[in-house]
């Protein structure tokens, strides 16, 4: 486990620090493709929201639940509660639920932050949410890596 002091502000990777009981969101993460201040909310929740929600689940996963609020090593929750809580806090589901709840409020500011983008008018807001989520994990692999690694089932 690393503490907050071991991270650089220019990192573009969120993390949960069990030692500090804190979510680390370095400044390097608050830029494209993860965040854009004026981007529609479906893109922000689909990308950065999902990433941060995922990292928050580490507070209750197997290693994370062994630290208390002061960073001391001990089991603070019974395993049965841990399993049910972890299932409910899945990053993608939590971010999607939060975004949908925000939309349900229906004020004009929320509506304005969910306008469709030019060139993407054929997609629904829900589709764009999941496209933003998928874009987080997309990358271009060199051909030799694609051919040397057969497709595998990974959770």
Model features per residue range: what roles?
Residues 1-49, 56-155:
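Zinc-dependent metallohydrolase catalytic domains
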């Amino acid at each position: 486990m690393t503490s907050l002091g071991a991270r650089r502000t220019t990192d573009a990777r969120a993390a949960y620090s069990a030692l500090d009981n804190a979510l680390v969101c370095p400044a390097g993460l608050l830029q494209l493709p993860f965040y854009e201040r004026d981007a529609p909310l479906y893109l922000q929740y689909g990308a950065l929201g999902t990433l941060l929600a995922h990292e928050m689940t580490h507070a209750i996963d197997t290693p994370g639940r062994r630290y208390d609020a002061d960073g001391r090593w001990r089991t603070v929750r019974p395993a049965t509660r841990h399993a049910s809580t972890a299932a409910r806090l899945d990053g993608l589901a939590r971010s999607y639920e939060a975004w949908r709840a925000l939309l349900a409020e229906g004020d004009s500011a929320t509506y304005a932050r969910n306008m469709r983008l030019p060139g993407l008018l054929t997609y629904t807001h829900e589709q764009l949410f999941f496209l933003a989520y998928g874009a987080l994990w997309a990358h271009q692999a060199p051909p030799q890596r694609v051919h040397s690694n057969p497709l595998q089932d990974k959770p």
